[in-house]
């Protein structure tokens, strides 16, 4: 049995009503909070990821890395952000200023909005719309438009080539990514991220989808790295060929938005892998045992707080383990050529994801208990 955990909206409403606010006013005050929580979670995730990348990269190269900005350099990402914030915002003379400004916004906004459907507990998510996976795929398809727009509007050959590469890469890897997720949806009979995690809670770690979908897991992770433009798939901004790709003409906060979107997307992809394949917030011990040890009913506030906290910690730990793997891959794999990138997507991952989907359908019919019949 899974504890219902914390209900953010209900808890917030009850707290305000305790101070004398009416339910209508409490509801009105709740409305702006989800996006604020999403922004805070995304920014904190980026700051932690940037610091980890700097320190892990330094360790791989036998360097110390940042150490002066705060203890162990933990304030270095914040210092970098402040530096970009005060830099001059330059628009090239022959650039399309409207599209040049709109491009970075179209890149970062869909990634931030995608956090709305990420669950950290049974009720510990911003928006349980029931079709969270569909929404995430829809939002992710907007990003290539912003990348191509940025490259085109810069009026620079390197920027345009980088934008075209980014769009081609994103389109090539979105299809096998969606097919890998479709196999999970088929087993769960739901597009809800909450239902997908709930389906993995029956037998602890043995219930995780990674054991039933090992091929789908690998397809999803490879495609996620390509969508995030991480090595070995960072062709849109290959320094030796394209200066900085679609980012070449950008400076200041517009450049920072690309930087921000890349790391938010990396953390988002890692959290989604945790949710889809690694049991999400899955509690390491039965909730009934915890409630009995605390001598509390299973729906007691204390039990809910503990299970909610542990659920968040479990989800974040699994996600940052994958971020650690992505950072190591940056320094241990060479960049692929553009023809190799497209061949991998269209000639290998796409057929493999189709076969994986068909095999999952067959196993669902043959073994309905194990594969969600």
Curated annotation (Swiss-Prot):
PROSITE patterns under this entry? COMPLEX1_ND1_1 (PS00667), COMPLEX1_ND1_2 (PS00668)
Q: Which domain of life is it from?
A: Bacteria
Keyword tags? Membrane, NAD, NADP, Plastoquinone, Quinone, Thylakoid, Translocase, Transmembrane, Transmembrane helix
**Primary localisation category:** membrane
Q: Which reaction does it catalyse?
A: a plastoquinone + NADH + (n+1) H(+)(in) = a plastoquinol + NAD(+) + n H(+)(out); a plastoquinone + NADPH + (n+1) H(+)(in) = a plastoquinol + NADP(+) + n H(+)(out)
State its location(s). Cellular thylakoid membrane
The biological processes this protein is annotated with in GO are: aerobic respiration; photosynthesis, light reaction
Q: What's its top-level EC category?
A: translocase
Q: Which GO terms describe its cellular component?
A: plasma membrane-derived thylakoid membrane
Its EC number is 7.1.1.-
Q: How does it sit in the membrane?
A: Multi-pass membrane protein
Q: What Pfam families would the database entry show?
A: NADHdh
Q: Where exactly are the transmembrane stretches of this chain?
A: 28-48, 98-118, 129-149, 177-197, 205-225, 267-287, 309-329, 348-368
Q: What's one GO MF term for it?
A: oxidoreductase activity, acting on NAD(P)H, quinone or similar compound as acceptor
Complex formation: NDH-1 is composed of at least 11 different subunits.
Q: Which PANTHER family match?
A: NADH DEHYDROGENASE SUBUNIT 1, NADH-UBIQUINONE OXIDOREDUCTASE CHAIN 1
Biological function: NDH-1 shuttles electrons from an unknown electron donor, via FMN and iron-sulfur (Fe-S) centers, to quinones in the respiratory and/or the photosynthetic chain. The immediate electron acceptor for the enzyme in this species is believed to be plastoquinone. Couples the redox reaction to proton translocation, and thus conserves the redox energy in a proton gradient.
Family label: Belongs to the complex I subunit 1 family.
- Descriptive protein name: NAD(P)H-quinone oxidoreductase subunit 1
């Amino acid at each position: 049995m899974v504890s219902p955990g914390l209900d953010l909206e209900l808890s917030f409403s009850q707290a305000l009503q305790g101070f004398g606010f009416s339910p209508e006013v409490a509801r009105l005050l709740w409305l702006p909070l989800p996006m604020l929580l999403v922004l805070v979670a995304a920014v904190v995730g980026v700051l932690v990821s940037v610091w980890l990348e700097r320190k892990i990269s330094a360790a791989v190269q036998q360097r110390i890395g940042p150490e002066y900005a705060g203890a162990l350099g933990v304030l270095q990402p914040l210092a970098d952000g402040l530096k970009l914030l005060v830099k001059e915002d330059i628009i090239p003379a022959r650039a399309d200023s409207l599209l040049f400004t709109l491009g970075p916004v179209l890149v970062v906004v869909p990634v931030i909005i995608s956090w709305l459907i990420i669950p950290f507990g049974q009720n510990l998510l911003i928006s349980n719309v029931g079709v969270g996976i569909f929404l995430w795929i829809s939002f992710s398809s907007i990003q290539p438009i912003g990348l191509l727009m940025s490259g085109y509007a810069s009026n620079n050959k390197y920027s345009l080539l980088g934008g075209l590469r980014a769009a081609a890469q994103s389109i090539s890897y979105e299809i096998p990514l969606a097919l890998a997720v479709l196999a999970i949806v088929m087993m769960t009979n739901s597009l809800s991220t909450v239902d997908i995690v709930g389906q993995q809670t029956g037998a602890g770690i043995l219930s995780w989808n990674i054991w039933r979908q090992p091929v789908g897991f690998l397809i999803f992770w490879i495609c996620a790295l390509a969508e995030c433009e991480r090595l070995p798939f960072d062709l849109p901004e290959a320094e030796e060929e394209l200066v900085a790709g679609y980012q070449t003409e950008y400076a200041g906060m517009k450049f920072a938005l690309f930087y921000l979107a890349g790391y938010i997307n990396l953390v988002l992809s890692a959290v989604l892998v945790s949710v889809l394949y690694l049991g999400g917030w899955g509690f390491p011990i039965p909730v009934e045992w915890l409630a009995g040890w605390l001598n509390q009913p299973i729906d007691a506030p204390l039990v809910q707080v503990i299970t909610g906290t542990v659920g968040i910690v479990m989800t974040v730990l699994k996600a940052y383990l994958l971020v650690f793997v992505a950072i190591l891959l940056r320094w241990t794999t060479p960049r692929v050529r553009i023809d190799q990138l497209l061949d991998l997507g269209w000639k290998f991952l796409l057929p493999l994801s189709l076969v994986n989907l068909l095999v999952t359908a067959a196993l669902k019919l043959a073994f309905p208990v194990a594969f969600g019949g």
